[in-house]
């Protein structure tokens, strides 16, 4: 069972790998794009970059692997298209989803995701969590991505809650860093999955 810090007034949930079991499907989509183009997407790198926008991840991957002739933005968009074709396979991560269900309507709750808005909304639909949240902040809504705290600070602002009174549920190191930098309490859900 997940231990929730006391003295909270609001929850902010990361989506991919926290509220929804999307990470294996995102990785599969990444692999399909890379394999189609003749290279591999290292699984360790994928999980290290968890929480960052797809386009940024692919752009960084091209640089890190010194792969020339590919546009990280185009590959990222292609990966998102493939993910959306596979989205019906997404299930909620029940240990976290049950927390959201039990607090629905009792406290303000938000999504703070590094995903694109369209993908986030379709993922929430796939797991039947649309209309659960007072705020949804995606990479389309901020200038700086996780590990910068902007995503979570914007979610707190939109809920009208002081950042120090928010608990963030996260599965990625960049998101955990972002929550701490925002002065929020954070639950690393990887300990419970």
Where are these regions (language model features)?
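Metal-dependent phosphoesterase signature
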Residues: 62-98
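Short beta->alpha linker loops
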Residues: 25, 49-53, 78, 91-95, ...
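Phosphate- and divalent-cation-binding pockets in alpha/beta enzyme and binding domains
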Residues: 29, 57, 95, 119-122, ...
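Helix-loop "lid/cap" segments that line or gate small-molecule binding pockets
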Residues: 33-34, 53-68, 123, 156
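Short, acidic loop-to-helix structural element flanking the phosphoryl-transfer center
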Residues: 84-111, 117, 121
């Amino acid at each position: 069972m997940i231990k929730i810090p006391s003295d909270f007034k609001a929850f902010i949930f990361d989506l991919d790998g926290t509220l929804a079991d999307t990470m294996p499907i995102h990785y599969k989509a990444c692999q399909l794009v890379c394999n189609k183009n003749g290279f591999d997407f290292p699984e360790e790198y994928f999980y290290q970059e968890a929480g960052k926008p797809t386009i940024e991840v692919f752009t960084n991957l091209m640089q890190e692997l010194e792969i020339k002739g590919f546009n990280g933005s185009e590959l990222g968009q292609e990966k998102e298209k493939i993910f959306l074709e596979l989205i019906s396979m997404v299930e909620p991560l029940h240990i976290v989803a049950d927390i959201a269900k039990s607090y629905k309507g009792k406290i303000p709750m938000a999504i703070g995701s590094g995903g694109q808005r369209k993908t986030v909304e379709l993922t929430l639909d796939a797991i039947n969590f649309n209309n659960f949240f007072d705020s949804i902040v995606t990479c389309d809504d901020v200038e700086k991505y996780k590990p910068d705290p902007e995503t979570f600070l914007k979610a707190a602002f939109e809920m009208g809650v002081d950042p120090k009174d928010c608990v963030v549920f996260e599965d990625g190191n960049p998101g955990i860093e972002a929550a701490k930098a925002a002065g929020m309490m954070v639950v690393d859900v990887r300990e419970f999955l």
